[in-house]
């Protein structure tokens, strides 16, 4: 009975529930490159679903790994220059005259399902437990309870608290505000942060 009330089991339950759906898979912290802000295997899988990808490689790059490295480098350069991850996910970017798409948003409903964007169904959501998000500074070696990735890119973080251990969503929010540096690159890049307990989910931020 105690194990069911343990915070780690609470986290494990959520991760396994998500990974059990058709929308998600479960990845490990070692799959994610903190410096490059990407799970490159998941990003590559999504890129391969785009008809332009093989043409781009053939015409402009030595091989697929070379092309992938440039895509990841471009993403990081744009983020470093102030472009938001949301903008990159929505708009993608041009590379060697071809549009690189990093995500596909839900198309408008039509009477003909064939009109829907086929790439939308190829989006890959991943859940990662206990993922380190910094290798230096204030946040060095800190871990996120859960992180959600879209096509390998980090979009959501969650800090979990189990009420059975005497902590609530308030403690989770406090942890974000006192133990997460607001200028951390990973945290600034993510779209949203949540504090969560057994009964409540609240938006929060790494600054007081």
Q: What are the language-model segments listed below?
A:
Residues 1-205:
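An alpha-helical interface "stripe"
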